[in-house]
């Protein structure tokens, strides 16, 4: 079992898993990518709603209540690995369940907003490509993978890991693999609007996570959690995607006649799903 430390009673320092882990390098706004197989992204909506509700419920009681929630529901490697224990008043769930519960906690409105914005922009198409049930399993598995890697890198940490970005990193990686050529509207450095292919902006984001992980990055951000989500997302999307879903999709652009009788290329909604990429 190993030597136990004194029960943890107050761990105000949090190892946050930031959804926009490169600061304000870019803010995603919108993608030109229509749903092909589902009519509505129910799971993505539900995940956003749950994250918002959990945030509100854990902050309404003041700082003391918030800290207690972070201790009871956050992922604390030393507690999970049984080298430390929580004081009894903070034990809310079995420690192993914190591999998932931590992903629904956020430190502040900016932490929550950044993660949910990424999920809003990229989650719907990944849900479309995987199907509702498999997408939910994918999301939770990426969250677990983020906690696993964080716990492997810092097994004796007594700081609660919180934030959805292990799961979000998996979603972003899956989007890059499935839709590399789709154009994404972003605000670069929070002020410059750009419309660029996903394979540029998302590949740069993923690469930056590895660079920051290797360099150490900010002390309060768990880059290891991001790496776990990225690796899980890259593997699981290949296994869980619907049959017939390609790995190199793109916007559909076709030539149409302009009013003046001259051809012009415009973006149009995709046709009805083919049997290989249809509803299930």
Question: What is each stretch, according to the model?
Answer:
Residues 2-280:
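A detector for small-residue-rich transmembrane helices and their helix-helix packing motifs
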């Amino acid at each position: 079992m190993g030597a136990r430390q004194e029960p943890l009673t107050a761990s105000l320092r949090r190892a946050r898993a930031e959804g926009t882990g490169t600061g304000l390098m870019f803010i995603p706004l919108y993608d030109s990518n229509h749903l092909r197989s589902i009519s509505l992204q129910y799971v993505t909506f539900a995940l956003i709603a749950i994250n918002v509700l959990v945030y509100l419920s854990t902050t309404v009681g003041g700082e003391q209540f918030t800290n207690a929630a972070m201790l009871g529901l956050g992922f604390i490697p030393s507690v999970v690995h049984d080298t430390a224990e929580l004081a009894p008043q903070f034990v809310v769930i079995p420690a192993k369940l914190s591999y998932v519960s931590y992903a629904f906690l956020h430190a502040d409105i900016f932490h929550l907003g950044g993660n949910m914005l990424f999920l809003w922009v990229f989650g719907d198409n990944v849900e479309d490509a995987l199907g509702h049930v498999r997408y939910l399993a994918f999301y939770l598995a990426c969250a677990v993978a983020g906690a696993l890697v964080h716990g492997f890198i810092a097994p004796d940490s007594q700081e609660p890991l919180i934030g959805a970005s292990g799961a979000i990193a998996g979603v972003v990686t899956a989007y890059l693999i499935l839709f590399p050529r789709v154009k994404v509207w972003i605000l670069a450095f929070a002020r410059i609007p750009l419309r660029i292919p996903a394979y540029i902006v998302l590949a740069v984001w993923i690469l930056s996570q590895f660079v920051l992980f290797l360099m150490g990055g900010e002390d309060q951000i768990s880059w290891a959690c991001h790496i776990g989500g990225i690796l899980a997302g890259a593997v699981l999307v290949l296994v869980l995607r619907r049959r017939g879903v390609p790995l190199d999709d793109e916007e559909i652009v076709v030539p149409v006649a302009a009013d003046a009788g001259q051809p012009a290329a415009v973006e149009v909604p995709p046709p009805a799903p083919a049997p290989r990429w249809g509803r299930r």
